[in-house]
Amino acid sequence: MVTQYIPLKEKYEKEVVPKLMKEFNYRNINQVPRIEKIVINMGIGEGSRNADLLNKHLKELAAITGQKPVITKAKKSISNFKIRKGMNVGLKVTLRGLRMWNFLYKIANIVLPKVRDFRGLNPNSFDGHGNYSFGLTEQFVFPEITPDQSPKTQGMDIVIVTTAKTDAEAFKLLEFLGFPFKR
């Protein structure tokens, strides 16, 4: 269990909820959108044929998230990618609760400012149902990973799942939490 102090959760409860209630005219606090979970997905490419590389990426993702990843397997064979059904093709972690809030804080305040040539998150990456997706091209922006200990640069996809009904609600939720969006 994570017992770390969660500044972002406190900010959500004390600052973001009242702002969202005022902006969207919610009458009940349960109508306010909240973040349900964060899903981090990492495709491993040639790691499907190299068990050592798979284990290194598994340890990296575990260090980044604080939770052991699940190995995802191919659902069907694709000859062009040299993938057979059942081969390991990726790693996935679903974060909820305190780990989710810690990861959100780390993404917004530590990781995104370290991304090279970062000009803000794309505000058009919402899925129409209030969920936000973005990708990172390398894992070295996380403080837990150093370039000399990692064998290969590996990107990842991050999906923030919210209870928001519209993209506008989700956008304001993430913006009030401190996510830097492009203008």
UniProtKB/Swiss-Prot annotation:
NCBIfam families named in the record: PRK00010.1
PANTHER family: 60S RIBOSOMAL PROTEIN L11-RELATED
Assembly with partners or alone: Part of the 50S ribosomal subunit; part of the 5S rRNA/L5/L18/L25 subcomplex. Contacts the 5S rRNA and the P site tRNA. Forms a bridge to the 30S subunit in the 70S ribosome.
Protein family (similarity comment): Belongs to the universal ribosomal protein uL5 family.
The name this protein goes by in its record: Large ribosomal subunit protein uL5
Keyword tRNA-binding: yes
Example GO BP: translation
InterPro entries linked: Ribosomal_uL5, Ribosomal_uL5_bac-type, Ribosomal_uL5_C, Ribosomal_uL5_CS, Ribosomal_uL5_dom_sf, Ribosomal_uL5_N
Domain of life from the UniProt record: Bacteria
Organism, as annotated: Pseudothermotoga lettingae (strain ATCC BAA-301 / DSM 14385 / NBRC 107922 / TMO) (Thermotoga lettingae)
Known role: This is one of the proteins that bind and probably mediate the attachment of the 5S RNA into the large ribosomal subunit, where it forms part of the central protuberance. In the 70S ribosome it contacts protein S13 of the 30S subunit (bridge B1b), connecting the 2 subunits; this bridge is implicated in subunit movement. Contacts the P site tRNA; the 5S rRNA and some of its associated proteins might help stabilize positioning of ribosome-bound tRNAs.
Record's keyword annotation contains Hydrolase: no
Gene Ontology MF annotations: rRNA binding; structural constituent of ribosome; tRNA binding
Entry keyword set: Ribonucleoprotein, Ribosomal protein, RNA-binding, rRNA-binding, tRNA-binding
A GO CC term assigned to this protein in UniProt: ribonucleoprotein complex
Pfam families reported for this sequence: Ribosomal_L5, Ribosomal_L5_C
